[in-house]
UniProtKB/Swiss-Prot annotation:
Name of the gene: MT-CYB
Transmembrane segments: 34-54, 78-99, 114-134, 179-199, 227-247, 289-309, 321-341, 348-368
Record's protein name: Cytochrome b
Role: Component of the ubiquinol-cytochrome c reductase complex (complex III or cytochrome b-c1 complex) that is part of the mitochondrial respiratory chain. The b-c1 complex mediates electron transfer from ubiquinol to cytochrome c. Contributes to the generation of a proton gradient across the mitochondrial membrane that is then used for ATP synthesis.
Natural source organism: Aphanotriccus audax
Upper taxonomic lineage: Eukaryota, Metazoa, Chordata, Craniata, Vertebrata
Gene Ontology molecular function: any one: ubiquinol-cytochrome-c reductase activity
Amino acid sequence: MAPNLRKHHPLLKMVNNSLIDLPTPSNISAWWNFGSLLGICLMTQILTGLLLAMHYTADTSLAFTSVAHTCRNVQFGWLIRNLHANGASLFFICIYLHIGRGFYYGSYLYKETWNTGVILLLTLMATAFVGYVLPWGQMSFWGATVITNLFSAIPYIGQTLVEWAWGGFSVDNPTLTRFFALHFLLPFIIAGLTLIHLTFLHETGSNNPLGISSNCDKIPFHPYFSTKDILGFIILLLPLMTLAMFAPNFLGDPENFTPANPLVTPPHIKPEWYFLFAYAILRSIPNKLGGVLALAASVLVLFLAPFLHMSKQRTMTFRPLSQLLFWTLVANLFILTWIGSQPVEHPFIITGQLASLTYFTILLILFPITGMLENKLLKL
């Protein structure tokens, strides 16, 4: 009998082991769909981004008009641009839900998979930031100025670093050119890191809602989870298309309809919604260096998750105290997101500071203590 090509061909064998014959726990829920949804987001962003790059000009005098030209004169240019801009929002929704799932179900105990995932998040954040600068609107320009300026808080080398990043003494043409180059490059780095992420995941196999070994009860990925993933794709693409068609500017900033002007500062400089939680943490500390450190810590704290796990149980499925803490953290992140969009005025300043303090307290102190307390309760 001829050998099965799917199982023996050097390339098809890899696809087979990852997407067809992959042994998968039979009880993984819809929360496990977000990995594949992120893959679809990445592919959509690369495709729409490539089409946009064909019509874009990375020059301060032409960038804004080239984006307007794409929307007005290119066949379906408006749709490609709207899909790309709103696709970024959906990408972040998916990645935040994916991280939340990993946190809830203790997936961070697969350390390599978790760490590559956090690196992926950081790379995605960098990509989104440099991409937001490209249309060269007011918020693009001032967002770039404010965020890159944060590097000047680094002692001794800060100012040199900022001028090196700008390619001059302010955000100008060299900055835009290099940001375009980076925005083109980074998604492909993300794609490469994704393969590493999956390689590490397939070393251990997927976790499951019970957090126990599922080796005795696994089913092939195809047709069960391939079908489930396709349903996920449809459910993901529906809101994306709806947003892109009916409310394309709903998540954007109206300030970005004005071309960049270094002489006029917008009344409220704020990033896109998906960075607001970190922006609120940055603003909650009155010291520049302290704010930058807190901003970095807000994401880098994820690297500590495996070391802060004190519970004898992997997931939070049967840990009501940790569940309460988890949902408090989620609510806290919503509060931070809201605070980040507000002006720096009385009620918002103290609220942001309390929310920032709560964020780090829950992650670094309360989670480990609760884990140990639940271990004690198990013995009663």
